[in-house]
Curated annotation (Swiss-Prot):
Belongs to the bacterial-type ferredoxin family. FixX subfamily. GO terms for molecular function: 4 iron, 4 sulfur cluster binding; iron ion binding. This is Ferredoxin-like protein FixX. InterPro entries: Fd_FixX. Keywords: 4Fe-4S, Electron transport, Iron, Iron-sulfur, Metal-binding, Transport. Could be part of an electron transfer system required for anaerobic carnitine reduction. Could be a 3Fe-4S cluster-containing protein.
Length: 95
């Protein structure tokens, strides 16, 4: 029988090359609150975090580039979603 997979361990193997000068995801200044709440629940990397004051904070570093937030929030919560420029982004390492 195999042991359960620990997602944090699997994600920890990935390498992230963050483009500090050009974020590939930009949250709207007047983002729809319900759309942001949905992104908090849906992001598999947990990059959308609800703060104590009820606001939602986002950090694109660590993005898996899966497109979940693009599908759920582009237009309502997100101003921009594009893949990172060449040589930047996630490098999946399976091991």
């Amino acid at each position: 029988m195999t042991s359960p997979v620990n997602v944090d361990v699997k994600l920890g193997v990935n390498k992230f090359n963050v483009d500090e000068e050009h974020p590939h995801i930009v949250v709207k200044a007047d983002a729809d609150k319900q759309a942001l709440e949905l992104l908090v629940k849906a992001c598999p990397a947990g990059l959308y975090k609800k703060q104590d004051d009820g606001s939602v904070r986002f950090d694109y570093a660590g993005c898996l580039e899966c497109g979940t937030c693009r599908i759920l929030g582009l237009g309502s919560a997100l101003e921009q979603w594009e893949y990172p420029r060449g040589t930047f982004g996630v490098e999946f390492r399976y091991g």
